[in-house]
Amino acid sequence: MNKKTVSILTFAMLGALSATAQQKTALSYWFDTPVTLKGQQVWYGGHPEKWTHKKPISAGDTARNPDSDWESKSLPIGNGSIGANILGSVEAERITLNEKTLWRGGPNTKKGAAYYWDVNKNSAHVMQEIRDAFAANDWEKASQLTRKNFNSPVPYESYAEDPFRFGSFTTMGEAYIETGLSTVGMSKYRRALSLDSALATVSFVKDEVSYQREYFISYPANVMAIRYKASRPGKQNLVFSYAPNPVSTGKMVADGKNGLLWNARLDNNDMQYAIRIRAINKGGRLSNEGGKLTVKGADEVVFLISADTDYKANYNPDYNDPKTYVGVDPLATTQDWMSKAEGKGYAQLLDEHYKDYSRLFNRVSLNLNDAANANDMPIDERLANYRKGAKDFYLEQLYYQFGRYLLIASSRPGNMPANLQGVWHNNVDGPWRVDYHNNINLQMNYWPACTTNLSECELPLFDFIQTQVKPGEKTAKSYYGTRGWTTSVSSNIFGFTSPLSSEDMSWNFSPFAGPWLATHLWDYYDYTRDKKFLSETAYDIIKGSANFATDYLWHRKDGVYTAAPSTSPEHGPIDEGATFAHAVIREILLDAVEASKILGKDAKDRKQWEDALKHIAPYQIGRYGQLMEWSKDIDDPKDEHRHVNHLFGLHPGRTISPITTPVLAKASKVVLEHRGDGATGWSMGWKLNQWARLHDGNHAYKLYGNLLKNGTLDNLWDTHAPFQIDGNFGGTAGITEMLMQSHMGFIHLLPALPDAWQKGSIKGLRAKGNFTVDIYWDNGRLTKAVILSGSGEPCQVRYGDKVKKMKTQKGKTYEVKF
């Protein structure tokens, strides 16, 4: 995979937005109060010199983070590779910068490649001993053996070792544009984010002068652009400065008369990164002294920033080469992007950006109760009113589209997938290292990708999975004695697939993280029917994952196959066959069987997969009517744990449905009723999807309301706490599930429409089979659906209890009424 990185281009010019960017402005949110600069250089309270690698407190912990405005008040923009947050202070614009591959850790630390890679325990021989303990009903022995043998020497906290080999996503620093203004006498302040154009703006009036700023990050041009303008000439008095990542060593030098170059390496792993800055002024004076660019009395000012790292992904890493993930010259790339961006100018960059972004974003439109143009109050006020019980259908459709906006901004082809915080992070270290969490969080990030017509945005996930396969083969063999590949609970960008050092197996033992990830490749094929993708990219990964799952199963003497040992992620004991593990295994085996048949491959393997499906332990219903989470009926009816792993077969899987397995669906409903309607933001997002799969629109709507009220920050980011982006994507996916489902082999229209949404439409959804679907309803009932066939396959459509079947032709549209 060739990493795609970006430049940032900052313009401050007079003039209006281009005509294309003004064509649609309906979806946006805004604040009417500026933020302060109290979070400036948040790392260690503005004292980066206090950083040491042994510091026992993570700077990313929310309770110790003085930068609450960044988390809840900033405006996030991005193009998949670069993320930036706009704080919008009047005195000095503060922009936090991220490049998704700026990571500490990996094989290039001072202890070298062997220190990084030689971490897998040879624990496969213990598997039979654990199973013998289960057979003897000695669960304590089985648990002890698992705890002692299925971890690694790699800690999860940066203070626990030097150098910290797992690493963490880290800030690329902050940019400041001082204005010489104050808030005294200021009025009409507005800081806004348009979802229609992916454009952030700041505007205010000061001393009878109107000031405006505009910000966007272009994917096609690899640039971020910022424009300052005012109602009078000569009002741009700006000082640009840059605060670098404090755990790096570099040098700021002049880059021509009007530019700066920061060339640095991270202290932990010697990763090189470069940031170029230039200033172009029209009118006034420009000086370049002391690492700052100063403009006085200008009518227009342009600041250019380009940023990159030396990281390059590797599908087949050399375990003896510490530089196996090094392959880019950031000095060359930043110079190339800088020159091209300068030559285009602001208007062309904006036009390119808008055309590229709108091509994706405008594919889907949602209208709820004719609330399309109700953007009449600040977003924090809207949320406050909603929390008090006010109806706000505009907010509900805005949040839906915000999830799609975030996916476009944080996941585009050519780079890493969206991590725990997408592509936005304001610190050296962060919550859960801002990593790739493989026991739901990374998967949840991509739940809305195909259904909301953003399938291209899922491609980075598949690139990432391919970086996991080769190292994951070593993990599968050494720990579990299986064929194929898998990964564990947490991954980085350097092919890490092993467990971590903790003996807490409830979270650290996650052998089915790999199979869960692999199901996404089949789903992508099922939505797109891209047979070339299935053959050339997906199949070998799916096959390897299915072989891992098949080999992992314990063949008990009674003829039942169980996943021993296994857990229900982050919850409960080590088990001889947790429901979650069996549900994931069913899913990946079903995927592999179907893929094998389509491609006419691997009949011998397919027979093994089909045999496993016949013998795997069935779902069980417990003493209070619940779908059991473990092989024994030990579920606590008062348990309100955030993870609902045992309902994987209901969602995101396809082995539990009110239509095909009503008894299991009823037992799943009992689980959700007892788990409650609260928990973390992402957990409410998951439950929203599960209630939708149960076809209970009113309860799904209740979860959606709770997500907005209790799991959403003022800038619409999801909160765990702290900020985690997965809940945003889970929420968007859940709303889609309320309005359309296609996972059971047919297009199900309005399967969970709530009473609150009496009238509306959604256009551009994608259904499995390569269909595009528009849905219209009024008075709580379907009026019509319009279906475009992308592959000419047979189509089955369901509404309520009625079903229609039809043959289709590729490229033709069909209107369906019931």
Q: Over which residues does each language-model region extend?
A:
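Well-ordered alpha-helical segments within folded domains of soluble proteins
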Residues: 439-450, 510-522, 580-590, 645-654, ...
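Extracellular/periplasmic, surface-exposed regions of secreted and cell-surface proteins
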Residues: 499-515, 519, 527
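Beta-strand segments within the central parallel beta-sheet cores of soluble alpha/beta enzyme folds
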Residues: 28-30, 239-241, 421, 460-463, ...
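Alpha-helix N-cap/helix-initiation motif
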Residues: 69, 392, 434-435, 506-510, ...
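Aromatic-residue-lined binding/catalytic grooves and analogous aromatic/hydrophobic interfacial grooves
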Residues: 22-505, 523, 543-547, 556, ...
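Non-catalytic carbohydrate-binding regions of carbohydrate-active enzymes
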Residues: 522-529, 533, 537-538, 545-555, ...
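Acidic/histidine-rich catalytic neighborhood
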Residues: 544-598
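Bacterial Sec-dependent N-terminal signal peptides
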Residues: 1-23
